Amino acid sequence: NSLLSGGSTQYGTFTWSDTVKDTIPTVGTYSYKVVFTPSADTEKNYETISTTEQDVSLTVNAKSLNDARVTVSGSYTYTGQAQIPAADAVTVQLDGETIPKDRYTISASDNTNAGQATVTVTGKGDYTGTASGTFIIGKATPNPTIPTELNAVYGSTLKDVLLPKGWAWDTPDSSVGNVGEKPFAATYTEDNRGNYNTVQKDLT
């Protein structure tokens, strides 16, 4: 919204002309018509005073997004690649209004590994400045090959039964027990454990 003030030495009011009063100005400097309407007292005291229309120059500056609130919807899981939320997933609000998506660009940082990532919007067109929000990249769940055909000797413990890389018995000191097939809990952990969940399985 634009506020109009006048510098005339005569008493009266300034208003936007009917031809431009509903115009929403964009960033830049433009000419708009303004109407000066003298008050009743002014008309009595000045014979030549009448309603006057004049072009005035109006400069509209871009609005800063620095205080905007940025939120990100959706879920994100580690893929090994940098992830930038789509425009539809990003909402920017300023002074209670949602900023149109074509008024800013979107970038992200710390957005490859699992954990908290940052999304930054940069104003363009009618907006300037930047604002940031966060989103979470969750750990991925691996799909390891499940060890099979494991064999143990009576009287031994689980730690005597070797497992493929990444797998470990949950209770390595436990006895394998009597002869026969039995399940024992084991956990698979990726080398890049910060980005992957562990996988637990009962192995036989």
Label each residue range with its predicted role:
Residues 1-204:
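Solvent-exposed beta-strand/loop surfaces, strongest in extracytoplasmic domains of secreted
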